Design a protein with these regions (language model features):
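Bacterial N-terminal signal peptides
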Residues: 9-19
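Boundary at the C-terminal end of the N-terminal hydrophobic targeting segment
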Residues: 20, 25-27, 32
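Mature N-terminal segment immediately following signal peptide/propeptide cleavage
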Residues: 38-85
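Carbohydrate-binding surfaces of carbohydrate-active enzymes
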Residues: 56, 72, 85-86, 105-139, ...
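Acidic/aromatic-lined carbohydrate-recognition and catalytic surfaces
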Residues: 91-234, 258, 266
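Short acidic/polar inter-strand loop motif in beta-rich domains
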Residues: 263, 770, 816-820, 939-948
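Aromatic-lined ligand-binding clefts that engage carbohydrates, nucleic acids, or primary amines
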Residues: 717, 880-907, 914-915, 934-938
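Short, well-structured beta-strand segments enriched in hydrophobic/aromatic residues
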Residues: 891, 929-956, 960
Length: 1005
């Protein structure tokens, strides 16, 4: 494996300034290979992406349905198509009602299962693939195929009874350990003289007291109106035989007994709040897999993994009260009645305790599960990656006050996810990677929650581009399912995902898409993310599905387009920030020009407020939102903590009612009541990017890499100057000088760019600008549209080599003020290739062996059922004649509409796969005067064949899969198969297909 680690760490920064420099490539998700291996230039790595920057795939074992032959077949296919690694995942019992899986072939972690996994590791090693394994028998939880006894997750329960004092109370309690119940506390809560709530047992005060039955789950918030004015811990009044003896003082008291029990139905799950339980689980499963890997651990088996959290949400754990005191600074027992619905002291105090309780649940989950697993993996020579609780349901107690960034920061490789189409959760893991110094931000890619096999390369590309712009740089494609031959085609599948295994019709054409992803990942691992702003929103930063347009649910400030930001949390603010030259900097090199404090609510920890003041005094510029903090969270040091927050808020925001404006604090600047964009521009920081498209910017030591994605033509402005822009096309690997650009008065560079539909490009600034370049072009059609008429192919010794597709006058103006005018001759007229076309289908998939299309017709509209319901590859063949003038100039083949990918050959020469716009192929130098033969193999998706088969009895169907339609009214209809009522997808070569001609012209300047 080529060692790519130094590109990530920034050693390559100086390399990028030199076009001919040699350099190592970017870090792979696993461990770096031997540094003595071959080094490649960045340009060469871009043209031919090395393994270390290629994407991975989720490799699903559907209930252990694999064998040695299928394992070898799958892994060889991954390697051949351009995957560099795999995440092995055998999940059982997860949404099996959506798409029922086949029967289990072998039990999870059984000797045969482990033998298959060992074989997979050796095959991956043979092929040079890296491997991660999901450390669970289930998706969405941490569990194995065995009951874990007392290590299972627990919930807090309570029961209560009312007594009236004074009196001597004696009663029998069921002893701890009965029914696997652990006592937590026995408390007596005195009310303020008003009638108390009814007891859970329904007993009156004069009746016998029972505290051993009628258990209830804890409550989310207090329901009683009368506050508890005193809480007494009477746990010590219970003797070894479970007999309570207590002299009840005067007053109305509620006795509340708290205990924890294992959550019903979760006897196989692990208590994620308990460090020892998690460690025992790792020792049982992780250690076994490490033993099986032997010398491949850390070499081929590089990671363990956990997916999004959808498992048990425990509300207590053994020893939780000690962890509470450790994290919150006080013992919780006096406030536990709040969890039984009582108000202790006041509603405000009760709310603060609830916040502390939920925060502690999150901290235990974060540190004792994810943090511990990372520690254990690292100790074993592996890395840990997970989605750290995503997709982050704030209704779950463990996540209500959790710090999303800190959760993700407990990974060696933070991971998010995005769904096709247009649903993403990529910004949080990218931000966590930036602020915690992790070089890679991963994403579960292309998860699909609709009917299967509808997706194809051109359709999913926009979502990939959006994820890249959101900051992730390592794709793990979801999903590549293991499906041995006996399951037929399309075969067995998991209920969700964009499928990409060899049973997928377009799998053999997937290589260029995977190379595209690899090139993007290579470039987005260079240098560091460029963001002008870091934003602190409070003690529980959180972003849900979306692009991070808002940094909290209630923003008072908005960052304008063309500026980028990262969230920072309290942990990073306290432990990783410093000020250099007025910028906020992190130990790993991230640098922000401005700290924004835009709070989600009025609650801030005093230590965070102190740190913000310290940063300002050290020289930072801080922009404050309208929401002024008034209190601290929780009960630590209450009420003096609130007083400190108010005092520090006054130092930052000024006195109540103070006017907006700018003022100094120490060496720094405080800005209140001003838009962030205005504050940045006042510091001489113009927008980083201006244009109609999505973008991301990576800053190098002496250069810049921008990725832009969108459709159409535009003049784009980049905040860099004195550098020659280059356009690096990730779809083809082509690199060319832009040549046409101009400098602005505010130190930026404007580059006209033309993108096809859902197109993208990298704009790289690394070399000093040439003394002469083109600053404007006027063609037959004025304005930036000229980019569609003229392409600057490359620089030449005399100026620039142009490709022209329109006749007429062109005028180029250079940076030296020179005007270069010329008249382009009319190119030959385009040739329409309407037909006839000979088309060959695969009879084994229901198509005619050969048929003639007089004109191009979508397969789904053809009268022949064998064509209309066909899925797979069909070969088109036609001939065309060119004269000498046509054959000697520029020639391109425009395919028009394609459903869904095409491979082109001219005169027997393969010209590659066409999978995305502009759906053209360069034929220059590949055609000849006279007759030429054109062959186009077109591949569609499985949909039409599956719809056709749904019309047939099972024994006559050509396809076979566990994904089938059960009932039209089934609530899981969208996850299932097809019916005759479903619409066919446009398929085949739809066109119009034509040959277009142009000419070359050298512009001298």
């Amino acid at each position: 494996m080529i060692n790519l680690s130094r590109l990530i760490t920034g050693v390559l920064v100086s390399v990028l300034a030199l076009a001919a420099a040699r350099c190592p490539a970017a870090e792979s998700p696993g461990h770096a290979a031997d540094g003595g291996r071959e080094r490649v230039s960045l340009q060469e790595a871009f043209r031919r992406p090395p393994d270390a920057v290629k994407p991975w795939a989720y490799w699903w074992w559907i209930k252990g349905n694999v064998d040695e032959a299928s394992i070898t077949h799958d892994l060889e296919a991954m390697k051949r198509k351009g995957f560099a690694g795999l995440l092995m995942f055998d999940a059982r019992g997860y949404h099996e009602d959506h798409v029922p899986p086949p029967p289990s072939r072998m039990d999870f972690m059984s000797p045969e299962w482990r033998r298959m996994l060992r074989f997979a590791m050796t095959e991956a090693d043979r092929l040079g693939l890296q491997m991660s394994v999901n450390l669970s028998s289930c998706a969405g939880a941490l569990k194995g195929p065995w009951e874990v006894g007392d290590d299972a997750p627990k919930k807090l329960i309570w029961t209560s009874a009312e007594v009236q004092g004074p009196k001597c109370l004696q009663c029998e309690l069921a002893r701890e350990g009965e029914d696997r119940r652990w006592d937590v506390a026995l408390l007596a809560a005195r009310h303020d003289g008003q009638a108390g709530a009814k007891t859970s047992a329904g007993a009156a005060a004069s009746e016998a007291v029972s505290l051993s039955d009628a258990w209830q789950d804890v409550q989310d918030k207090p329901t009683s109106k009368s506050p508890v004015v005193e809480v007494v811990d009477i746990s010590g009044k219970v003797d070894a035989n479970g007999r309570l003896t207590w002299d009840v003082p005067e007053g109305r008291w509620t006795l509340v007994r708290f205990a924890c029990v294992i959550m019903e139905g979760h006897e196989y799950d692990v208590d994620i709040l308990h460090e020892k339980a998690v460690e025992a689980y790792f020792e049982r499963m992780g250690k076994a897999l490490l033993d099986d890997a032997g010398p491949l651990a850390g070499k081929t088996l590089t990671h363990f993994y956990s997916v999004s959290w959808e498992g048990a949400a425990p509300t207590w754990s053994l020893g939780f009260e000690r962890q509470f005191e450790r994290y919150r600074g006080y013992a919780p027992q006096a406030y536990l009645p709040v969890l039984a619905g009582m108000t202790v002291e006041s509603p405000g105090v009760s709310d603060r305790f609830l916040r502390d309780y939920h925060k502690t649940l999150g901290d235990c989950f974060m540190n004792h599960c994810y943090g511990k697993l990372r520690e254990l993996c690292n100790r074993a020579g592996l890395k840990w990656h997970s989605e750290s609780g995503g997709p982050w349901n704030r209704k779950i107690p463990d996540f209500q006050h959790a710090d999303q960034l800190a959760f993700l920061g407990r990974n060696d490789m933070p991971q998010g996810e995005f769904w096709y189409p247009t649903r993403g959760l990529n910004r949080p893991p990218a931000m966590a990677a930036h602020v915690y110094g992790r070089p890679l931000a991963a994403t579960e890619s292309f998860t699909h929650m609709r009917q299967h096999w509808c997706a194809y390369p051109a359709a999913i590309k926009p979502d990939a581009d959006a994820a890249f712009c959101d900051g992730v740089n390592h794709f793990i494609w979801h999903t590549f399912s293991a499906s041995p031959p006996e399951f037929g085609k399309p075969g067995i599948e998991y209920f969700a995902g964009t499928h990409v295994n060899p049973n997928v019709t377009w799998f053999e054409q997937a290589g260029p898409l995977l190379a595209y992803l690899a090139r993007c990942q290579l470039m987005l691992r260079q240098g560091r993310f460029a963001a002008d702003v870091c934003c602190y929103t409070g003690d529980k930063p959180y972003l849900h599905w979306g692009r991070g347009e808002k940094w909290n649910a209630n923003p008072t400030l908005v960052l304008g387009k063309g500026y980028a930001y990262d969230l920072v949390n309290t942990e990073v603010l306290l432990e990783r920030t410093s000020v250099q030259d007025g910028d906020l900097v992190l130990p790993d090199g991230m640098r922000y020009r401005v700290l924004v404090v835009d709070l989600e609510d009025e609650t801030v920890p005093p230590r965070a407020m102190r740190r913000i003041v310290e940063l300002a005094e050290a020289g930072a510029t801080i922009v404050l939102g309208q929401r002024r903090p008034t209190r601290a969270p929780g009960l630590r040091d209450y009420p003096t903590c609130d007083e400190e927050v108010v005092r520090l808020a006054k130092r930052l925001w000024g006195p109540e009612g103070a006017k907006a404006g700018r003022r100094s604090l120490g060496q720094g600047k405080i800005i209140v009541g001003t838009e962030i964009d205005d504050a940045l521009q006042a510091k001489g920081i113009p927008r980083d990017f201006e244009g109609p498209w999505h973008y991301i910017h990576r800053r190098l030591g002496d250069g810049d890499v921008y990725f832009v994605a969108g459709s159409g033509q535009a003049e784009c402005t980049f905040r860099t100057s004195g550098k020659e822009p280059e356009l690096w096309d990730p779809a083809t690997g082509a690199i060319r000088d832009a040549v046409w650009y101009r400098a602005t008065d505010d130190g930026r560079t404007v580059v006209p760019i033309r993108l096809p539909e859902n197109g993208s490009t990298f704009v790289v600034f690394r070399r000093p600008a040439e003394p002469r370049h083109v600053v404007s072009v006027v063609g037959p059609e004025e304005g930036v549209e000229t980019a569609s008429q003229m392409e600057i192919e490359r620089r030449s010794d005399a100026g620039a080599q142009l490709r022209l597709w329109r006749k007429g006058p062109y005028v180029l103006e250079t940076s030296g003020g020179e005007r270069v005018a010329f008249e382009a001759a009319a190119p030959p007229e385009p040739i329409a290739l309407a037909g006839p076309w000979e088309v060959r289908f695969a009879p084994e998939w229901g198509g005619p062996e050969s048929i003639t299309f007089d004109t191009l017709t979508p397969w789904n509209e053809h009268p022949n059922d064998g064509v209309r319901y066909y899925s797979g590859t069909a070969g088109y063949r036609t001939k065309f004649a060119l004269d000498a003038a046509q054959a000697s100039g520029l020639v391109r083949l425009a395919l028009g509409q394609v459903g869904q990918v095409a491979e082109v050959r001219v005169n027997g020469r393969a010209l590659g796969v066409v999978w995305t716009a502009p759906w053209t192929v360069d034929l220059t130098g590949r055609v000849k005067p006279g007759e030429n033969e054109l062959e186009i193999d077109v591949t569609n998706v499985w949909v039409n064949r599956l719809i056709g088969d749904s019309r047939l009895p099972p024994e006559k169907r050509l396809t076979k899969s566990n994904v089938r339609l059960f009932r039209e009214t089934d609530k899981y209809r969208r996850f299932q198969g097809f019916s005759p009522k479903d619409a066919l997808m446009p398929s085949g070569l739809i066109g119009p297909v034509r040959l277009e001609f142009g000419s070359r012209q050298e512009a001298r300047f």
